[in-house]
């Protein structure tokens, strides 16, 4: 008999928070993005680096004291220096970076940065990225009070070509 034991995490997923309360305030989302950047940076700095590949509000728990916990490492993988591409294409539609489903190359830390950018967009707008029109509309079109700087950060995270994104979480954290 096989038993799987998992930690109980008190709190709610960020997806549930957005469902219940709608788009979240910019200052709160920036704090959450910084926390998630530090988590991803930690994973990417392991030897070998760990690529999470499934960042989305449903996989982030908000604990009562305001800290976040990333859950569901089911499709995380080690980055393989000698590999030209991933063996399987996995990810959540709308949140997954293009390289996750096009089979063009190996996912790396820039893949997680893309997913984080989409997650931040969702938290600020309340719009699921897998809904029509299947593209990220600038956040200021949803709420003109949101900052243009944060809009540029999201756009930099979610560039189609990984070479045009932030190259690591330190760069993103600095801009946040």
Give the location of each predicted region.
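Conserved short submotifs of the Hanks-type protein kinase catalytic core
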Residues: 1-13
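AlphaC helix of the protein kinase catalytic domain
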Residues: 14-24
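Activation segment signature within eukaryotic-like protein kinase domains
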Residues: 32-33
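Protein kinase catalytic-loop region centered on the HRD/HxD motif
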Residues: 38-50
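Activation-loop N-terminal segment of eukaryotic-like protein kinases
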Residues: 62-66
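Regulatory activation segment
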Residues: 68, 80-90
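C-terminal lobe helix-coil module of Hanks-type protein kinase domains
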Residues: 94-176
């Amino acid at each position: 008999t096989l038993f799987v034991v998992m930690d109980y995490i008190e709190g709610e997923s960020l997806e549930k928070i957005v469902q219940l309360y709608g788009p979240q305030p910019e200052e709160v989302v920036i704090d959450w993005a910084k926390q998630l950047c530090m988590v991803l940076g930690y994973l990417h700095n392991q030897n070998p680096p760990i690529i999470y590949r499934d960042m989305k509000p449903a996989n982030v728990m908000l604990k009562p004291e305001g800290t976040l916990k990333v859950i569901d490492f089911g499709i995380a993988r080690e980055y393989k220096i000698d590999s030209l591409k991933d063996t399987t294409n996995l990810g959540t539609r709308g949140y997954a970076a293009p390289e996750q489903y096009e089979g063009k190359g190996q996912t790396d830390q820039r893949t997680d940065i893309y997913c984080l950018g989409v997650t931040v967009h969702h938290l600020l707008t309340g719009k699921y990225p897998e809904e029509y029109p299947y593209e990220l509309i600038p956040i200021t079109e949803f709420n003109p009070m949101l900052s243009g700087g944060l809009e540029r950060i999201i756009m930099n995270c979610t560039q189609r070509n990984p070479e045009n994104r932030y190259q690591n979480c330190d760069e993103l954290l600095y801009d946040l």
